[in-house]
Amino acid sequence: MADKSTEVEKAIDPIIDLGNLLFIDREPIQGDASEGLEERARKNTQLLFNNIWQLEQKRVEEAIIVTLPPATYRLPREKRLPEKKEPTKWEKYAAEKGIEKRKKDKKVFDEATKEWKPTYGYRRGNDDTKDWLIEIPDNAEDPNKDFFAERREKKKERVAKNDMQRMKNLARQMKTTVKSGPSTEKMIGVGVDAKEKSKQQVRFAVDRAKLATASAGKFQEGLKGEKANVKTGKKRKFEANEAPVSGEKERALQILQRMKSKKAKIVEEKAAAVAGPLREKKEKSERKGAKDQTRQKSQIHRQQWFKNKVDGKKKGTGGAGKKGANKAKARKG
């Protein structure tokens, strides 16, 4: 395959931004866009590299590099540029004294094993923490004390001191980076403000924070006088499929005992709702029975009245006959 020429000519000058390695081809596409697209991309890339190699060059360890000029196009960013952090206390001191950070070797020669080992970390060389013997210095105040424990305590103090310095540096940086602006205490989607939460909400928040550990709060130490964690839910435990008969009998007896000991709970609202229609029905039936009873009595009275009237008529007719007969007898006499 023959080498292609590095000379590229364009009818319309392209826009080249070497700072962003941006190449904009302004020539219009004629005909089918898919045809000759690879050739066009090759020429544009070649022209971009031709402009790059026209910059100032220098050699660094068998490699030729160039320094790109400032960008002409300002590319949009999702977030603003990070601000320069406040130097730490040690960085300020090192700058004043002219102390430069020296790069330490990753490996060190271990005199005990005569091998090269990592300077730090696991199986590091010249590890004094694994010494089985510590030489007592001549100026020791108490030669009988535990020098191994003293070395461990000193290491703990150094770690605590470094951690304290780190926290101070973070606090110093926060004072410089935090800007005054609108209050961010009430943010959308965050929930209720901490000052406006109720006692129960705060308690639940504390319990959730305690459970948000690798051990689900099992090894979380509590404060003095702090209440126990609120159990918002219990894990359901199932009984074994095969269990002895004695245990089943005891469980059945316990259930029966609980049922006997429990008193029936009467809900007044439900009882009134159930008893209301029954009471109305009973009163209605009583009123109807009273009406029937009154009506029955009146009927009996009416029947008795008619019967007495009929009997009275019969008695009256018989008496008049007797009186007439008596009168006739008296006249004859």
UniProtKB/Swiss-Prot annotation:
Region (Disordered): 227-248, 271-333
Annotated Basic residues bias: 324-333
Entry superkingdom: Eukaryota
GO biological process, alphabetically ordered: endonucleolytic cleavage in ITS1 to separate SSU-rRNA from 5.8S rRNA and LSU-rRNA from tricistronic rRNA transcript (SSU-rRNA, 5.8S rRNA, LSU-rRNA); ribosomal large subunit assembly; ribosomal large subunit biogenesis
Record's subcellular location: Nucleus, Nucleolus
Residue ranges, compositional bias (Basic and acidic residues): 278-295
Keyword entries, A-Z: Nucleus, Ribosome biogenesis
GO CC field: nucleolus; preribosome, large subunit precursor
Pfam families: RRS1
Principal location class: nucleus
Protein family per UniProt: Belongs to the RRS1 family.
Job of this protein: Involved in ribosomal large subunit assembly.
Protein name stated in the entry: Ribosome biogenesis regulatory protein homolog
